[in-house]
Design a protein with these regions (language model features):
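Active-site beta-strand/loop signature of hydrolases that rely on acidic residues for catalysis
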Residues: 40-47, 66-92, 124, 154, ...
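Residues that flank catalytic or metal-binding motifs in active/ligand-binding sites
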Residues: 38-41, 117-120, 148-152, 161, ...
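Short, well-ordered secondary-structure micro-motifs
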Residues: 55, 98, 115, 177-178, ...
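Short, solvent-exposed loop/turn segments at secondary-structure junctions
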Residues: 47-50, 85-86, 110, 127-130, ...
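Structured beta-strand-rich core segments of catalytic domains in phosphoester-bond hydrolases
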Residues: 25-34, 59, 77, 81-170, ...
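Alpha-helical scaffold elements lining the catalytic groove of polysaccharide deacetylases
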Residues: 57-58, 64, 176-192
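N-terminal, active-site-proximal structural segment of metallo-dependent hydrolase catalytic domains
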Residues: 2-95, 110-118, 299-304
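Metal-dependent phosphoester-hydrolase catalytic domains
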Residues: 18-32, 192-202, 210-304
C-alpha cells in the first residue's frame, strides 16, 4: 500500500482539482428513475487515480476505459475513491454526464497552492442529491496527511423514499488500527448520529482499509458506526487482490476484502444484495485491470 502513494507525494504541488460541482441538467433528466425500476443500485470503487503526473499507471487510458464500462452500466449512483487526478475526472465526466448528470466533489478540495490535495471522494449520480455535511478527519498518518481524507453525507429520494449516502476513504492500512478507529468514530459522531432521522436509511460506502478477515477490527468498525454488513453474492470475495491484476502484480499481498457498503437505520429497506464487481476493459497492450481494487456494488429494494 505504501508504494501507491510514492508518486502521489511528488505530484501534490502541481495537482489542480475541481471544487464541488454539479453538472447542468436537462428537464428530461428529472424523469429518472422510471416507475418500473424499483431497485437502487450503488457502486463504490477505489479507481487508483493518483495526481496527473503519475505516468506509471496511465491514468488517461484507464479513465477512458473506466468511463466506457460505467456508461453502459445500470448503476444509479457511483461513489469513487482516489479520484485525485483532474484529467482523469474530466475524461470520466465527459463520457458519463449524459447518463449521470449530477456530480459531487471532489470532497474537501484544496486551493491550487496547497501542499495537500482533496479527499479523492467523487460521486456521479443519475438522481439529484443534497449535500448535507462533509468532514475532514482530525488525524492521519503517512502520505494520507497530504490528502484531505474525510467523509461526506448526501441525501436523496428513490420513488419518494428518502435515504442518506455516506462516502468515505479511511486511513491506509500501513498504519495502526487506532487511526482508522478514530476516523470511523468521527464518521459516526459527526455525520451518522447528528443527521440521523427516523425512517431514513443510511448507506455507508467506501474503502475502509479494514480487512474482513481481521475479525476484531472488522467487528469494531461495525459496532462503532452501529452498522450492518451482509454476505457477498457471486464468486469473487475480495476487493483487493494481486491475483489476475496487472497493477498489483508482484506485490505478493494476500487477497483482502476492505471495501464495503454498509447499512444503518435499515428498517425501510426490504432487501439488499452485495457483490464484488470485477470491471475490466482493454486500455493498453496486455492491460485489462482498471484499478488496484475491485469495486463493490449493492442492489437495494426499499419497502414500498
Amino acid at each position: 500500500m505504501r508504494k501507491k502513494f510514492f508518486f502521489f507525494a511528488l505530484c501534490l504541488a502541481q495537482s489542480l482539482l475541481f471544487p464541488l460541482h454539479v453538472s447542468s441538467i436537462r428537464p428530461s433528466q428529472f424523469c429518472y428513475p422510471p416507475a418500473d425500476l424499483k431497485e437502487l443500485k450503488i457502486l463504490s470503487w477505489n479507481i487508483y487515480m493518483l495526481p496527473h503526473l503519475d505516468f506509471k499507471n496511465s491514468n488517461k487510458l484507464r479513465a477512458a476505459a473506466i468511463a466506457k464500462e460505467l456508461n453502459r452500466s445500470d448503476y444509479s449512483i457511483i461513489v469513487f475513491q482516489e479520484a485525485f487526478d483532474k484529467n482523469a475526472r474530466n475524461i470520466i465526466r465527459e463520457v458519463l454526464h449524459e447518463n449521470f448528470p449530477f456530480f459531487y466533489g471532489p470532497v474537501n478540495n484544496s486551493s491550487w497552492y496547497s501542499t495537500q490535495t482533496s479527499s479523492g471522494l467523487w460521486i456521479a449520480s443519475r438522481i439529484p442529491l443534497n449535500e448535507i455535511h462533509s468532514i475532514r478527519f482530525d488525524i492521519a498518518s503517512g502520505f494520507d496527511r497530504f490528502a484531505n481524507k474525510g467523509a461526506i453525507l448526501l441525501e436523496g429520494e428513490w420513488h419518494k423514499q428518502a435515504f442518506q449516502l455516506v462516502a468515505t476513504h479511511i486511513q491506509s492500512d500501513d498504519y495502526g488500527w487506532e487511526i482508522r478507529e478514530q476516523q470511523i468514530r468521527e464518521i459516526h459522531n459527526k455525520l451518522l448520529l447528528p443527521f440521523s432521522r427516523e425512517g431514513i436509511p443510511q448507506i455507508i460506502c467506501g474503502d475502509f482499509n479494514t480487512d474482513h478477515a481481521e475479525t476484531e477490527h472488522y467487528n469494531k468498525m461495525l459496532t462503532v458506526m452501529g452498522a450492518e454488513d451482509g454476505n457477498l453474492t457471486g464468486m469473487e470475495k475480495y476487493s483487493f487482490s494481486s491475483d489476475d491484476n496487472e497493477i498489483t502484480k508482484g506485490l505478493n499481498e494476500k487477497p483482502r476484502l476492505i471495501d464495503y457498503i454498509l447499512l444503518r437505520n435499515s428498517h425501510a429497506i426490504e432487501s439488499i444484495s452485495r457483490k464484488i464487481a470485477v470491471i475490466k476493459n482493454n486500455w493498453g497492450l496486455n492491460h485489462r485491470s482498471l484499478s488496484d481494487h475491485n469495486a463493490i456494488e449493492a442492489t437495494i429494494a426499499f419497502s414500498m
